[in-house]
């Protein structure tokens, strides 16, 4: 009896992780599609990546393994490096071309 109640609560908690993950993923994808500012697009991308991390932790809690948390930490480190490179590119574009929006970057030629 107690085991079934505990398993129902665990499934309910895991479903809450996935609901939160899908909401954050939707907000991140919406921000990437609608916004024109490069920094806002980068923040939306980070939000979408963090939603995937929440899903990894939810899967980890369901299976009682630590693999999801390790993968989430690895993804956080990778996202930090990606954000640093992205901000560097955005700052150099702003310094050289005064380009803040995506529409101003489309005209760049290599």
Curated annotation (Swiss-Prot):
It catalyses: a quinone + NADH + 5 H(+)(in) = a quinol + NAD(+) + 4 H(+)(out). Keywords: Cell inner membrane, Cell membrane, Membrane, NAD, Quinone, Translocase, Transmembrane, Transmembrane helix, Transport, Ubiquinone. It comes from Hydrogenobaculum sp. (strain Y04AAS1). The gene is nuoK. NDH-1 is composed of 14 different subunits. Subunits NuoA, H, J, K, L, M, N constitute the membrane sector of the complex. NCBIfam families: PRK05715.1-2 (NF004320). One of its GO terms (molecular function) is NADH:ubiquinone reductase (non-electrogenic) activity. It is found in: Cell inner membrane. PANTHER family: NADH-UBIQUINONE OXIDOREDUCTASE CHAIN 4L, NADH-UBIQUINONE OXIDOREDUCTASE SUBUNIT ND4L. Its main location: membrane. This is NADH-quinone oxidoreductase subunit K. NDH-1 shuttles electrons from NADH, via FMN and iron-sulfur (Fe-S) centers, to quinones in the respiratory chain. The immediate electron acceptor for the enzyme in this species is believed to be ubiquinone. Couples the redox reaction to proton translocation (for every two electrons transferred, four hydrogen ions are translocated across the cytoplasmic membrane), and thus conserves the redox energy in a proton gradient.
């Amino acid at each position: 009896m107690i085991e079934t109640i505990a398993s129902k609560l665990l499934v309910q908690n895991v479903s809450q992780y996935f609901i939160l993950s899908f909401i954050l993923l939707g907000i991140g994808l919406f921000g990437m599609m609608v916004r024109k500012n490069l920094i806002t697009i980068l923040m939306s991308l980070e939000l979408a990546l963090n939603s995937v991390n929440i899903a990894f932790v939810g899967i980890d809690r369901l299976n009682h393994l630590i693999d999801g948390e390790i993968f989430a930490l690895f993804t956080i480190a990778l996202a930090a490096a990606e954000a640093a490179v992205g901000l560097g590119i955005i700052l150099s574009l702003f310094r050289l071309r005064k380009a803040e929006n995506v529409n101003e970057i489309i005209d760049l030629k290599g």
